[in-house]
From Swiss-Prot:
Gene for this chain: leuD
Matches recorded under Pfam families: Aconitase_C
Gene Ontology cellular-component annotations: 3-isopropylmalate dehydratase complex
Record key words, sorted: Amino-acid biosynthesis, Branched-chain amino acid biosynthesis, Leucine biosynthesis, Lyase
Superkingdom per UniProt: Bacteria
Listed name of the protein: 3-isopropylmalate dehydratase small subunit
Amino acid sequence: MAKEFKQHTGLAVPLDASHVDTDAIIPKQFLQKVTRVGFGAHLFHEWRFLDDEGKQPNPDFVLNFPRYQGASILLARENFGCGSSREHAPWALDDYGIRAIIAPSFADIFYGNSLNNQMLPVRLSEEEVDELFKYVEANEGATITVDLEAQTVSANGKTYHFEIDSFRRHCLLNGLDNIGLTLQHEEKIADYESKIPAFLR
């Protein structure tokens, strides 16, 4: 069964960049894996590391700052996840430990892929996202709460509302991926299959 997402409070890391594409999120040389595990080690590889092997962390990249270690909420700017449609991008973010991404806008395919992989992309206005950036950057250890049931983001005593498709919300709240959705109708499927003539089975 997929992971449920109801409410999450976590340390937020501010990635102050617009139009972050999927090749930056997970470069093409790391796409050979056939399972979802292990991509987190290569997340933002070209930015996080100074060498090709990934052994020399770039001290100037925000995800490497000591204050943001263990972050589970990513703040980003507009058009996050643009570029190719590789599903490995949300796999890498999820494997790294990111549970929610907050940005003014997302590339459509990335947005859908994230939801399909039980990671919540939250769209807020540019002004609201900018407020969150300023709060997180000014307060070490700042956390943000994302409440999918209430469709709110809370931080620094303020609450922001976001919209999400009701079907997508239902799937996340109940931990339902495509297989889980199918299994909700398991009895009906079994009943239908039992009525199929033997020569058609």
